[in-house]
A protein has these predicted regions:
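Transmembrane alpha-helical segments in integral membrane proteins
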Residues: 62-80, 141-145, 212-228
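Secretory targeting signals
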Residues: 27-63, 67-74, 95-157, 192-207
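Aromatic- and glycine-rich beta-strand/loop motifs that create alpha-glucan
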Residues: 1-19
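Membrane-interfacial loop-to-transmembrane alpha-helix junctions, especially the N-terminal start
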Residues: 15-18, 92-96
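Terminal transmembrane helical anchor/hairpin motif
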Residues: 30-49, 157-232
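Pore- or pathway-lining transmembrane helices of multi-pass membrane proteins that form conduits
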Residues: 16-23, 150-169
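Short helix-to-coil transition segments within interhelical loops
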Residues: 83-91
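Terminal domain-start segments
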Residues: 9-12, 34, 87
Length: 232
């Protein structure tokens, strides 16, 4: 574990990211507009109405790990050749990069829910953390896929953020389909534990896992294609 953390720090210089991350977590927990966005965004009382203040804070929460992972991936890309020579094969380097992104995302999700222990029951915190973590892992996997498909692109993080925003806004405009959209699967306050019309926590968790599996399978297929192309 210590060796793995040392690699993370050496590649990404994560000590310099600690302060802005903590500041962002504090801002997200501030009850601006009466909402703690860590538990998600409540449904609008009026059809099509969007609380843009809460939406911006929620998007900041969801996209921050993507930005951190994007920074980590870019640092990994800089030492790609050295890492491949060290690990003897490209798959080991990719696995190390993916594990690093997963580690960052899980730690970030834990950091988000820790302050909730002062104000919410353990069951609520665990349910919110599981949904939030799985949903963030889904978007992180999409980020990794985009970086595999477009290895030299610098806009993959921005594209992920734009996708999250677009999908959520579509769900707000058409509530009848919102529970089938991936942005809703990480929002605890829209589950049946809080909302009478919400989907179950189990459904949201299963939907996140299913989507992660689909994106992962597609990513594996892309990697196989790239490998065959390189050999040819």
């Amino acid at each position: 574990m210590r060796k793995f953390l040392y690699r993370l720090d050496a590649i990404g210089n994560f000590k310099c990211l600690l302060l802005p991350v903590l500041a962002a977590v504090g801002l997200l927990h501030a009850r601006i507009s009466g909402q703690n966005v860590v538990l998600g965004l409540e449904r609008a009382q009026i059809l099509g109405e969007i609380d843009y203040t809460a939406l911006v804070r929620w998007l900041a929460m969801m996209t921050l790990p993507l930005l951190i992972n994007g920074f980590y991936i870019s640092r990994c890309r800089r030492i790609e050749l050295f890492s491949i020579l060290r690990f003897q094969k490209r798959e080991s380097w990719l696995e190390q990069m993916m594990l690093g992104c997963i580690f960052i995302t899980v730690c970030y999700a834990v950091l988000l829910v820790l302050p909730l222990f002062f104000s919410h029951p353990v069951q609520v915190i665990l349910s919110a953390w599981i949904l939030l973590m799985l949903n963030m892992l889904l978007w992180t996997e999409l980020l990794l896929l985009l970086n595999i498909v477009f290895p030299k692109a610098s806009w993959t993080g921005i594209m992920c953020a734009a996708i999250i925003c677009a999908v959520h806004v579509v769900g707000e405009q058409f509530p009848i389909i919102s529970q089938w959209l991936p942005t809703s699967w990480g929002i605890y306050c829209r589950t049946d534990m809080v909302s009478a019309n919400g989907a179950s926590v189990l459904f949201c968790a299963a939907a996140n896992l299913g989507a992660i599996e689909i994106v992962g399978a597609f990513g594996a297929a892309v990697l196989r294609y790239v490998k065959r192309r390189d050999y040819e």
